[in-house]
């Protein structure tokens, strides 16, 4: 049962809309202990918390976390817990039912990715889920925007061998950034919802 829809926090607080893949994931992933890695201004964390998920929301930007805390207080979301952390230097041990990272990994140092994904996998309870959406660098859509990291073709899928992939694709999507002509930049995005066996 959805208590707050995807437009609630957008309309009331002018946040970016909840990511479409999070909206799809909640059709499968039941409320439980959740970790949002790179939560930004809370577009996903606030939606999840308002709909019964117990959310840890982490981001390196203290101003973003302060904004999440402000909205959390107004909305009385006691099941939302924030922390300022640099994902490039992060290790964690708590067990989660759902760990998500949407359009965040491409902003991290490439050397961080294998360890961070391993940490996500280790800290996911059996039967729990990981959701990742991140930019790719492919021959047909090369990543020219200067991200420190972008997945190669099939790379994210290989990280999750042995997991049940509920959804996986490497479809073309658009960044919010635009090119010199004002057109949104197109890239492939690795999109995956996987369940730990």
From Swiss-Prot:
Its EC number is 2.1.1.265. Changing residue 98 to A/Y: Loss of tellurite resistance. The keyword Transferase applies. Substrate binds at residue 177. InterPro entries: SAM-dependent_MTases_sf, TehB-like_dom, Tellurite-R_MeTrfase_TehB. Keywords: Antibiotic resistance, Cytoplasm, Detoxification, Methyltransferase, S-adenosyl-L-methionine, Tellurium resistance, Transferase. Pfam families: TehB (PF03848). Signal peptide: none annotated. Changing residue 184 to A: 74% of wild-type methyltransferase activity on tellurite. GO terms for biological process: methylation; response to antibiotic; response to tellurium ion; response to toxic substance. It catalyses: tellurite + S-adenosyl-L-methionine = methanetellurite + S-adenosyl-L-homocysteine. One of its GO terms (cellular component) is cytosol. Residues 86-87 are annotated as: S-adenosyl-L-methionine. Homodimer. This is Tellurite methyltransferase. The gene is tehB.
